[in-house]
Amino acid sequence: MQNPVLSMTGNLMWTRSGVVWATWRLQGMPYGFAADATKQLARLQHQALFQGLRGEAVLLGLCASLDPVQVAERMLAGVEIGGRPEWAQEVALTLDGLADVPVGERTFWLTAPLAGTHAKHRARAAAHAVESELRDILALPRRVPSADEVAEAGIIARRVEEAIPGAFAPVRATPAELVWMAQHAQLRGLALDSEAPLPGSDGRRALDVSAGHARGTDERDRIVAGAAFAEPLLDEGGQSDLAPRSLDRFTPFRRRFLKVHSPCSDEASYQVLLALTGSPRGGWVVPGVEWIAKVDEFDFPVDWAVRLQVTSGQAVKRRNKSAENTLRDQITQQSVDGETSIIDNGGHLGDVAESLQSYADALGRSDKEVEVQATTILAIGASNPDDARTLAKHVQQTYQLAEFVFDAPLGGQEQLWWAMHPGAPTERLVRELAQITTGREFASAVPLVSTDLGDGAGLHLADNITSGRHGPVFLDLEGTIQANRSASIGLVAELGAGKSYTMKKIAGDLIDRGGRVFIIDRTEAREYAKFAGSLLPDQTALVDLMHPTASLDPLRIFGVREGARHVQSLFSAMLGVRPRDELGVELARLLSPENVATLGVTSLGSLRAVLAGSEPGSNGARLHGLMSMVAEKDLGRVLFDDSLPPLDLRARAIIPLTAGLPLPSEHELDNKHLFDELSLEKIFGRAMYAFLTGLARQICFSTAQFTMFCADECHHITTSPEGQAHVLDFLRDGRKHNAVAVLASHDPHDFGDVRARGLIPIRIVMRHTDPELAERALDWLERGIASDARILTELTENVSPAGTDGRVAPDRQGEALLRDARQRIGKVRIVAPKRSERREMISTTPVGPDGEALA
């Protein structure tokens, strides 16, 4: 067979058979880790797709390679790289690391011949094909379709497009994409495949039909000759590889493959085409055996195509009525004395009758039901025949475990290969291999499901390991905000699973890309102080509250006018000076602009000095006593020591260290008598956490620069009403101020109430071996999936699992379940920074005396 395409424009192609075909690129639906309700919706969308089609159609799932250069370009998108040498180095190292690692994605396509509503349309298309053949014979230039022909085809294609459910987001294919599909088939298995062209930004505008004419609105409307497709040399069984007298020529059963030699490559592709010839007699269990989607579980590319012939249920019922009458006659003729014979194959008629009745019942469930005749083809390629057959054998054996039989028909490899091409007519072998079912039943195969995660560009957060086809997962927090969506992140994991590592990975990349971060570090090991060593030293500010080298005095870091407001809030929580009490009113008077200027107040230390001269028993004296209670302790240095330089709010990374600062327990906060007896240290700690969270809010909400607030072990903040209120502000209003919050804890309930938990769109759940905590984490990840035993087992047993030695293998560290901003869920592995100094600084694994990691 020759290349079937004569010419094309937009998503339309005119073929040698006289039929015009149209092709759309489809978007897969999330499925693998979705809740049962979401899976049911996906099956219903597939059912609507099959029930909306009529006649012939082809569904394609092709594995597209992803060029490492494109990964680098996505990481650079939106970054002024000239002033970001650290990010440029990270991208360069990422590019080097991807050079030998195959990454890719699966692309989905629907292509269908356009059956004209009038005989003249079909006659015109046939005449065009005959004329093209004659011109080829006479060596004359081919005639391109006229504007009227394009317009007519566009109208018919629009009807097909309207039948495609919007959930699959159909976009009209371009000639570039159609050429890529043909080239991909010729280079299958050679690792030479180029990435699939990006779909147009407005694919639905490929044809602008007005007054019966097609107007070229962009490059996609240009008529492209079929010569754009390279003509391959097809050699079934690789006969050209055999010596003239080789005995292998007489053993064709051992050579069930197709050798494809493309003009685009000096190397031939060896491909095995498998066709579905048998399925479980009793059907398959759904969810659980979505058999077409199973191809993504292989760690090598497997393309698939489904040739469909869809017939309305009413037409099938009329046909089956005739079959029923014939079957009744056969049963009557084979009956003896009114009893059906079971000898000489007569007994099988009862099985036929039962099958016919079951099929009729299935068709009668809905007036929209259709009959689907589907020929399913899998294509596996390699650079040599042995590898191709080995991979194909693995596919066959894997499917055979579920009672699905795939065979490589002898002598039919070339026909199956062409059957996977848009525009190629259906040949006899393909029709003979069709499996007959209903639209509802075939929808349970859910072929159009995607494992895509993350954003189109941004920082490289993780590798997608949901399926055997690994690909990069990008996180574009700024882009998400610009799309008017929240970009806050929640991290949940048990101890040592990697939530702190992930938080530091995100924060470090954000700083390298030009953003700002505010991180509260409460760890005794001061791990974020260590992490700060990998950041820009002149733009990083560390504030150790217990051993301060910088002051957090609000009057000094904000200025007296703005700082006065923060002082009143701080003293309310720390000293019990309520704004409307006598002491609160006195404090407000002292910090008024007039008195501040008169008294020379520039800091809390100077304010305390002014109050030192107050009359005994006065409100000023009482304020001085309360302030001295804190100022004279080591706790108070960070607020009252004027010898310390004030915190520089211009720093790109601000990291307060709160290790050693105790906090009241939730029980103490809930019981008044316990709260009244709190130690000074706990009162101070509670007030400072609330102040730090407010400080973070002030910094993040007062700049146009993209800023991130990070709270590891966030229960230290959310246990207090003040801290919880500030966190809720971040989650509610961060988007408006170009800011996000990143919260981490062992339990999602630590993020706050149901409102706070629900306002976190990007959710990451790492290893949780405790079933109860794992269920809570999964219920937060997506309501409903906690009851799925398969997903619960996946989280507790197969996310960064420990080996027999109690250690997690290096290649299994950092695994997690991720729900992205588009609410798609999949399994990922967090990638480590490529720069060695950053990688060392964000690790929290203890090391022994020999320098080796202890865990």
Locations of regions flagged by a protein language model:
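An aromatic-glycine-centered, glycine-rich loop/turn in mixed alpha/beta architecture
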Residues: 1-4, 20, 37-47, 53-55, ...
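N-terminal basic/disordered segments at the start of proteins
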Residues: 1-17
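N-terminal pre-first-transmembrane
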Residues: 27-67, 75-76, 84, 155
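P-loop NTPase motor domains
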Residues: 36-54, 315, 418-472, 522, ...
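Switch/coupling segment of Walker-type NTPase motor domains
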Residues: 60-77, 88, 98-99, 501-596
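Surface-exposed, low-hydrophobicity interaction/linker segments
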Residues: 76-81, 280-368
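Conserved P-loop NTPase motor cores
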Residues: 471, 477-497, 501-509, 518-527, ...
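P-loop NTPase motor core of the ASCE superfamily
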Residues: 489, 563-606, 752-855
